[in-house]
Structures are given as structure tokens and as C-alpha cells.
């Protein structure tokens, strides 16, 4: 079956891992405590703070304890959904203030634009929240790229290393798994997508190999029609 849709990871794929770890995470770590204290009563924030309490098994945790938990989770790089949501809110504030610009590799920008023009439906699947994904592409160094994408998926669709997550996403895309090309730099994610029936292509930007999958060093080398 010809490829009709392309589902891409962000970290290490469209964007530098260093942007996430050296720019976004430190920004969130620095600004999260004040943001939570300032906005704790707002419904959207309060909902996420309650989710932190539930996840930690500490239903009576006060705001300062919740902040301490969030900072622990950041240090551990935990993929906790409420942490991701709150980080997204802090990043949105930073992007809107012009303090942050999303990093997207130039080869990824060019390829995504080209594929969009060719009629491929483009989607994102990242461990970062959907809001954070939209900000990286909507406020990127290359301008607003959000119009290229038909949809975004995060860990609310399931863990990235489990095949069922990719089946769930294919259903949500209303597209047979065999018509979807998944791009990632993590072999376990590629394995899971492949097990769900998707075509896969690995991004090995620093060289190296991604065993069991076709892989390239740049988006410029990906031809969806060849899968």
C-alpha cells in the first residue's frame, strides 16, 4: 500500500535533543515553581496539580509539596502526563513572551513542507504534551509550521514503546497502519510501530545504526513513495 500519512517523533528526529534538554527543560525547571504558585487556583492548573497528587499517592499534598514532586520528576526525566501539561503551560508563556523559539532542523522543515505540498497527511507523536508540540512547531525558528500538521498525539494515546499505542493512533487518524510511515530516532519506538503494521524509517543523525529498520541521517534522504 502506498504511504498516505507520515507520523513523526520530535526529540532527536525533527528537532535536536539538546533543545529539549538544554533549553526547554531548564526553562521549565526555573519558571515552574513561580508559575504554579501564581496560577494554582486556575481550573486548568488545579486539575494538573490534583493529578500530581493522585499519581504520587499523596492526596493531601500542599502546593509546595506538589512543586517539590514536580522538580523531582523533572530531575528524573519522568514522562508523567501532569508534569508534561504544566511544562507546556510554562513553555507557552515563554514562547508568547518571545523568550523561546522552537528548534526544527532545516532538513526537517524543508521535507515537511514538501510532503505537505505533495498531499501527505502529517502528524506528530511525542512524549511531550500536545500543547508543547504545537508550540515547538507554531513558534519555531523557521516561523509558524503548525499549518503543515493534521494532528498531534502524546502519551495520552499510550507509551511510545508499545505497539497498541500505534494501533490507537492509526484508528484516530482513520488510516490503515500500513499506509502510515513512522519516523523516530529510537529503535524501540520503531519496533513498536512496526509491530502495529506501520512502515518505519529511523533517523540516525549522529551516524550509527537502527537495527531492523531503514534509517537515514537526514529528512532530505527520505522518500515516502519508496516505502
Curated annotation (Swiss-Prot):
Molecular-function GO term, any one: magnesium ion binding
Species per Swiss-Prot/TrEMBL record: Pseudomonas syringae pv. syringae (strain B728a)
EC number: 3.1.3.77
Cofactor note: Binds 1 Mg(2+) ion per subunit.
Reaction(s) the record says it catalyses: 5-methylsulfanyl-2,3-dioxopentyl phosphate + H2O = 1,2-dihydroxy-5-(methylsulfanyl)pent-1-en-3-one + phosphate
Superkingdom, natural source: Bacteria
Pathway(s) this gene product operates in, as recorded in its UniProt entry: Amino-acid biosynthesis; L-methionine biosynthesis via salvage pathway; L-methionine from S-methyl-5-thio-alpha-D-ribose 1-phosphate: step 3/6; Amino-acid biosynthesis; L-methionine biosynthesis via salvage pathway; L-methionine from S-methyl-5-thio-alpha-D-ribose 1-phosphate: step 4/6
Pfam name, any one: Hydrolase
Gene: mtnC
Keywords: Amino-acid biosynthesis, Hydrolase, Magnesium, Metal-binding, Methionine biosynthesis
Record carries keyword Calcium: no
Cofactor(s) it depends on: Mg(2+)
Family: Belongs to the HAD-like hydrolase superfamily. MasA/MtnC family.
CDD domains, sorted: HAD_EP (cd01629)
Subunit organization: Monomer.
Protein name: Enolase-phosphatase E1
Function description: Bifunctional enzyme that catalyzes the enolization of 2,3-diketo-5-methylthiopentyl-1-phosphate (DK-MTP-1-P) into the intermediate 2-hydroxy-3-keto-5-methylthiopentenyl-1-phosphate (HK-MTPenyl-1-P), which is then dephosphorylated to form the acireductone 1,2-dihydroxy-3-keto-5-methylthiopentene (DHK-MTPene).
GO biological process: L-methionine salvage from methylthioadenosine
Amino acid at each position: 500500500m502506498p504511504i498516505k500519512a507520515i507520523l513523526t517523533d520530535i526529540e532527536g528526529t525533527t528537532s535536536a535533543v539538546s533543545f529539549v534538554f538544554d533549553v526547554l527543560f531548564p526553562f521549565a525547571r526555573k519558571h515552574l515553581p513561580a508559575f504554579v504558585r501564581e496560577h494554582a487556583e486556575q481550573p486548568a492548573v488545579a486539575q494538573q496539580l490534583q493529578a500530581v497528587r493522585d499519581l504520587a499517592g499523596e492526596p493531601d499534598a500542599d502546593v509546595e509539596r506538589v512543586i517539590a514532586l514536580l522538580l523531582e520528576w523533572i530531575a528524573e526525566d519522568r514522562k508523567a502526563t501532569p508534569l508534561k501539561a504544566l511544562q507546556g503551560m510554562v513553555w507557552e508563556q515563554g514562547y508568547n513572551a518571545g523568550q523561546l523559539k522552537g528548534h526544527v532542523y532545516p532538513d526537517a522543515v524543508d521535507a515537511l513542507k514538501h510532503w505537505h505540498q505533495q498531499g501527505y497527511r502529517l502528524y506528530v507523536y511525542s512524549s511531550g504534551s500536545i500543547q508543547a508540540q504545537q508550540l515547538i512547531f507554531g513558534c519555531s525558528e523557521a516561523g509558524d509550521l503548525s499549518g503543515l500538521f493534521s494532528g498531534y498525539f502524546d502519551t495520552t494515546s499510550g507509551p511510545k514503546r508499545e505497539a497498541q499505542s500505534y494501533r490507537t493512533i492509526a484508528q484516530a487518524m482513520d488510516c490503515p497502519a500500513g499506509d502510515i510511515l513512522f519516523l523516530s530516532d529510537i529503535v524501540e519506538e520503531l519496533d513498536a510501530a512496526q509491530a502495529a503494521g506501520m512502515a518505519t524509517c529511523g533517523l540516525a543523525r549522529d551516524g550509527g545504526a537502527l537495527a531492523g529498520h531503514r534509517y537515514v541521517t537526514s529528512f532530505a534522504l527520505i522518500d515516502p513513495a519508496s516505502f
